[in-house]
Amino acid sequence: MATLQAIKYSRGKLLVLDQLRLPHENHYDEVSTAEEAFDCIRSMRVRGAPAIAIVAALAHAVELHNGDCTATEPEEVIAHIEKRLDYLKESRPTAVDLSNAITLLKLATRAANLEGLAHPEAKEAILNTYIQTAEEILAKDLHNNTSIGSYGTAWLQQQYSASSEKPISVLTHCNTGSLATSGHGTALGIIRTLHSEGLLKHAYCTETRPYNQGSRLTSFELVFEGIPSTLITDSMAGALFNLHRERMNIGAVIVGADRVVRNGDTANKIGTYQLAVLARHHGVKFVVAAPTTSIDLETGNGSAIEIEERKREELTQISGAIVNEDGTVDTSKTARVAIADQRIGVWNPAFDVTPHELIDAIVTERGTVVKGADGKFDFSQVLPERLASVAARQL
């Protein structure tokens, strides 16, 4: 089955799908510098925690491959790389994948084997180490997403005895598919796997105001791949559970994550928290799908997560392609219109934090983590080394 690609990469060239033009136009921007990557991420032409990290890492790989670094001394080369990475880190501070990728790239670059090399060869070794590490981040993400899909499907099948005769329906929020990752997706990856195994009855997606990632992107992916699906507004979720849970066998809300902290509190797209509350009230499982790169063991709980706030116009204005009188869409014309009094005060956090108490399972590429008898998530089964390292530093 054909899938969408948000990122197209070959060494020395990076193309990023402009998701602001979807679903009406498929247009790829060439991203050749850290500045272009920063703007691409900040403007949300690319979004989704894994995709953000990949674009940042590969953009700098492209500029290094194409001769951006003029330094010759090994320490100066490393300093140049780290300065560019620190700049890119500020493009989306809530997404921990970006921070983790930058840490990995810095460590790998400093660990490059320079023994017996003169300065020109040492510089080349450092650059090659960076580029190869960035390319490995891309390849690993796709593998991880496929594993998340398998683990999540297995857990849901076990919870509901799902089968082709008794498929389940699910609700998802924001966009967590091929457009938010290197491919397949996290939460949407589980939905894809459920569908491919004949275990999915129906997928519901929220529009995800104010940026409409659900209506613009997730619905586009679901239709593109022929997955039975329905779009609802964010405010319809409670009514959906109340009126259709039994008839449609709605078993789970499946969401992604921009950051999961040590106790399981999860930062994700604004609106996630209220879905968790509704799911708990109606007896629907609430599942977070995230690679281990999105897990932040350094932060104890969600109160310490920095929440990005975005511009007021995202709530008071909206843009899109022109709809003709006969109902056809003219993608060559767009308009931006006001949908609120422009004088109204606006609060526009991009994310909220769902308390771990409302989460039933966190699905990673290494397995599904559930709460123990004490009501707490234990990440030792999927991140034993990182957890031990954090614990040792706290002694």
Swiss-Prot record:
Signal peptide: none annotated. It holds the Pfam family IF-2B. GO terms for biological process: L-methionine salvage from methylthioadenosine. GO terms for molecular function: S-methyl-5-thioribose-1-phosphate isomerase activity. The active site is at residue 258. It is found in: Cytoplasm; Nucleus. Its EC number is 5.3.1.23. It comes from the Eukaryota. Belongs to the eIF-2B alpha/beta/delta subunits family. MtnA subfamily. This is Methylthioribose-1-phosphate isomerase. The gene is MRI1.
